[in-house]
Amino acid sequence: MNDASSSTYLNGRIEYQQALDTVIEHARHSLRIFDYDLRDGGYNAVQRYERFKRFLLASSKNRLLIVLHRVDYIKRDCPRMLNLLREHSDAIFIHQTNAEARVASNPLLIADDAHYVHRFHYEQPRAEWVLNDLALTQPFLQRFDEIWQASTLAVAPTTIGL
């Protein structure tokens, strides 16, 4: 892995999804995702599922934290993500924002406190992709933590019905 810091601006959905894949590949310990509903990031694609699975199998200490404004899409249309949640229920946590965090509108994917993809607004494809920069990543870590604190567990690894 190259240790030089790099920053790239992205203007389209394909570039955005490719940047997400690259940042996920750089993850060694933690992945933090904040998104409106995961619909635009290719999160149900086979390749994304495989990347997450490799990350989670690399170490039992690896963690995937996801915060969404809306969870209906993941529950209804993301069977691969739900499969991962069932298989790695000790490592994946999917939260939904509370009212105070619903103003957040800039999706994030952060890997290991040093790499991120920051979409400027969930309705627009423009984004920034940064690798190997702890200083630039720090404000986004703080923002993610604020959103995480203003959220609650929303998607369980099992469905219990009568």
Model regions: which residues?
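PLD/PLD-like phosphodiesterase catalytic module centered on the HKD motif
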Residues: 1-32, 36-162
